[in-house]
């Protein structure tokens, strides 16, 4: 039977014996994507993409639709879970040198960009006060592009300001992009299995492999169970933990919130954007904060793949992790000293991690006489 052959192939998939829990986040991302698609579909059925009705339709979903509150909370908190998993997944890739599998890394970075775009469009849909102003600030960055900026912004907005056409096209984009994410995820997994996963030691795993089932399937199920428990606990007891209080008010173009900030998972990029006092410079830094990941496979000079045996690079990596958290924290603060100085130093250190990668590799080769 064909399905038995598929199961057999899945069961016989060879996996390195020593891959740790950090390798489980890929399957967790797949679970998050499935959850977002299902809950998103049921929300789209009841949502109305109109500036006069969008906010009311969200209230209608949470109050009147059976289990609508659960769908809405699962979708919103599921997005946060998605980003927690993807940031850990990327950190694992950076630490253990998974980026040397070039095609997988480049498709993964493209997936991250698509995911961030989808999440941004989704944040605008409730048409709350913070949704509206976050959309205004971010789409306005297009005007920084020389010559084409103003035309592109007007084209994106569908008018001379953010209005009904903007919301309609953002809903359309939020609906269509996940299908692109599914396609690219399939390609990402396909490219990964061309070469197979790396392992914590960064060595060739061919000499010591085990079948995927039952070992990795049970390991995946354990992590998925832990994630599900966390998700349901937050949905049941702290549903508004990630929400902005301003977003409980309907969008008002005449009143600017005291402090405009995006969802927590965009804070690091927003912090880098704000740290540069020039509009075009900030927009470029924002773009580069993600695009710089693409440089990693091409700047790896060390003879060792994993950071497990690279103490200098370990120090650099954990400094980078702390920097990521510091930028996210400063992005929640007002634009005034000392926060501006801290965010500028942190943004510089963020980019220094990627710039120092080839230097550190060369230095470690020299020290270890490799």
UniProtKB/Swiss-Prot annotation:
Q: Where in the cell is it found?
A: Mitochondrion inner membrane
Q: Which PROSITE patterns match?
A: CYTB_CTER, CYTB_NTER
User: What does the cofactor section's free text say about binding?
Assistant: Binds 2 heme b groups non-covalently.
Transmembrane region(s):
25-45, 69-90, 105-125, 170-190, 218-238, 280-300, 312-332, 339-358
GO BP terms: namely: mitochondrial electron transport, ubiquinol to cytochrome c
Q: What is its main location?
A: mitochondrion
| Keywords from the UniProt entry | Electron transport, Heme, Iron, Membrane, Metal-binding, Mitochondrion, Mitochondrion inner membrane, Respiratory chain, Transmembrane, Transmembrane helix, Transport, Ubiquinone
Q: Name the residues that bind a ubiquinone.
A: 193
Q: Which GO terms describe its cellular component?
A: mitochondrial inner membrane; respiratory chain complex III
Subunit composition and interactions: The cytochrome bc1 complex contains 3 respiratory subunits (MT-CYB, CYC1 and UQCRFS1), 2 core proteins (UQCRC1 and UQCRC2) and probably 6 low-molecular weight proteins.
Q: Which PANTHER family match?
A: CYTOCHROME B
Q: What is this protein called?
A: Cytochrome b
């Amino acid at each position: 039977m064909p399905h038995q052959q598929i199961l057999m192939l899945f069961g016989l998939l060879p996996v390195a014996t020593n891959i740790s829990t950090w390798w489980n986040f890929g399957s967790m991302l797949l679970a998050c994507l499935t959850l977002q698609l299902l809950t998103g579909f049921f929300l789209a059925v009841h949502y109305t993409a109109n500036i006069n009705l969008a906010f009311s339709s969200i209230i209608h979903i949470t109050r009147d639709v059976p289990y609508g509150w659960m769908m809405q909370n699962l979708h919103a908190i599921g997005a946060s879970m998605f980003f927690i998993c993807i940031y850990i997944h990327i950190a694992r890739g950076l630490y253990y040198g998974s980026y040397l599998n070039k095609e997988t890394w480049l498709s993964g970075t493209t997936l991250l960009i698509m995911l961030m775009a989808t999440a941004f469009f989704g944040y605008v849909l409730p048409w709350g006060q913070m949704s509206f102003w976050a959309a205004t600030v971010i789409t306005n960055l297009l005007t920084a592009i020389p010559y084409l900026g103003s035309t592109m912004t007007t084209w994106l907005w569908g008018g001379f300001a953010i209005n009904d056409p903007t919301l309609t096209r953002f809903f359309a984009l939020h609906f269509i992009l996940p299908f692109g994410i599914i396609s690219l995820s399939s390609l990402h997994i396909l490219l990964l299995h061309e070469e197979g996963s790396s392992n914590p030691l960064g060595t060739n795993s061919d000499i010591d492999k085990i079948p995927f089932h039952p070992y990795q399937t049970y390991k995946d199920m354990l992590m998925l169970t832990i994630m599900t428990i966390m998700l349901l606990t937050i949905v049941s007891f702290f549903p508004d933990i990630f929400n902005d209080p301003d977003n409980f008010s309907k969008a008002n173009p005449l009143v600017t919130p005291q402090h405009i900030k995006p969802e927590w998972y965009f804070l690091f990029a927003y912090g880098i954007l704000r740290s540069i006092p020039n509009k075009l410079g900030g927009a470029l830094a924002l773009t580069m904060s993600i695009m710089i990941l693409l440089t990693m496979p091409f700047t790896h000079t060390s003879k060792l793949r994993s950071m497990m045996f690279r103490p200098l690079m370990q120090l650099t990596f954990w400094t980078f992790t702390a920097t990521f958290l510091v930028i996210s924290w400063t992005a929640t603060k007002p634009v005034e000293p000392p926060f501006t100085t801290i965010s500028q130093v942190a943004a510089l250190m963020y980019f220094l991690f990627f710039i120092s990668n080839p230097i550190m590799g060369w230095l470690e080769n020299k020290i270890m006489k490799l």
